[in-house]
Amino acid sequence: MVKPERIKKTAASKDTEGKVIYWMSRDQRFRDNWGFIFADELRKEHKTEMAVVFSLADNFLEATERQYKFMLEGLEELYNELYKKNIPFYLLPGDPVEKLKKFIREFDIKHLVYDFDPLRIKQKWQSGLTNSLKINIYEVDSHNIVPARKASDKKEFGAYTLRPRINRQLEYFLDEFPEIHKRSKTEEFQLQKIDFNRAMASLNIDRDVKPVSWIKPGEKQAKKTLHYFIEKKLENYNIKRNDPNSDALSNLSPYLHFGQISAQRIALEILKLPHKNENIDSFLEELIVRKELSDNYCLYNKNYDNLENIPDWAEKTIENHRKDEREFIYSLEEFEKAETHENLWNAAQNEMVKSGKMHGYMRMYWAKKILEWSESPEEAMKIAIYLNDKYELDGRDPNGYVGCAWAIAGVHDRAWTERPVFGKIRYMNYNGAKRKFDVKKYINHWNS
């Protein structure tokens, strides 16, 4: 049974006898998915039928062919798995609100379940339904182990304030998922034949950013990637995770972003290991506390992608150093083409453009240099988000917005020694990177 704290009822109707749909969005899987499970519970409770629907929006937050291809190939695998279990799946291209309203009227839906999502655009879509439909509507948080609304009811200052709140509730929410069984074929919903190649071709999107081949999408591959990380990489994670030349990271972030794997499943598998150590502690800190801190920031601060509502000390130091002379100033086009004076930064940009996944340490360095070499912090934030969302497989995500805000505006950080341009925002430089890893090796790899 889904814990009631995961569920928020956002619209109610006395008319409860009717069909159920699970509007899949952020959590693109049916295994280990509390939203799907809750919709299935409603199906059983009301002795009715249920289908999964997915809204295929054009040009979602400037996503490109790279991200859409990864997502749609994952959805095709999901669709095939659901088909085998006689669970109907509908792909609805076009405006999400209008297409869902039409679907709900056509099939006389009485219960709608959707994924929790803190981003403005998703909440706008959800409000468009809750404000206009007289049916029962529920939000379920299956993306976070401790549901974001339960973890905290306000914007937290940093990991140090959210961590104890999560730790107090973690054991309660870290339960095992039930198995999903095959069902009888439905009468009301038809098992659809979906041409995913045609769906991909129909999209009005940027086709210049091409898919990457080093990572394969889908729930099955996500689980293989997890088990490879546990068996081959986890034992050195804490020592090597800040070395971009070491293949020490999990590579799970694209799967987490698209919901092709559950953070809760990852944690459950990691915690099965016989001996807890600093590698496990470090990884779970990133997976749980830092990831959920990003959702917290975006949930309780609708200006998550700009410099409104940043910490007071950061706002003051940015104003104090706004007019400081910059030694270098680059345009968006120069940043995008990796045409700066610094080979290390150019290598990081090339890594992102070529692979769709910049190393975590370099993401911090990359964003801080954009602050240093832009006309203003506001311009730096726009450039960093634009490039991150355009090229990263895991772009358009709370983690990305908060990562840029941390680097550029001191969000979830503290004041550091004051210096030109940065003020009291944490500083990173080339010499610091040299002390951490073989900079020349990294540069040669990505600038060749």
Role assignments for model-derived ranges:
Residues G35, G74, L78, A222-F229, ...:
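Alpha-helical packing segments of well-folded alpha/beta enzyme cores
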Residues E65, K69, S213-K216, K220, ...:
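Charge-dense, low-complexity intrinsically disordered segments
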Residues M1-F177, N350, K369-S374, E379, ...:
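Trp/Phe/Arg-rich N-terminal binding region typifying the photolyase-homology
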Residues R31, F70, G74, G218-Q221, ...:
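Soluble or luminal CAZymes and related metallo-dependent hydrolases
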Residues P4-R6, L42-K47, Q67-M71, Q190-F196, ...:
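Short, functional N-terminal and low-complexity linear motifs
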Residues R26, D243-K440, W446-N447:
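Active-site-proximal binding-pocket segments
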Residues T16, A148, K154-I310, F437-S448:
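Glycine/tryptophan-enriched, flexible segments
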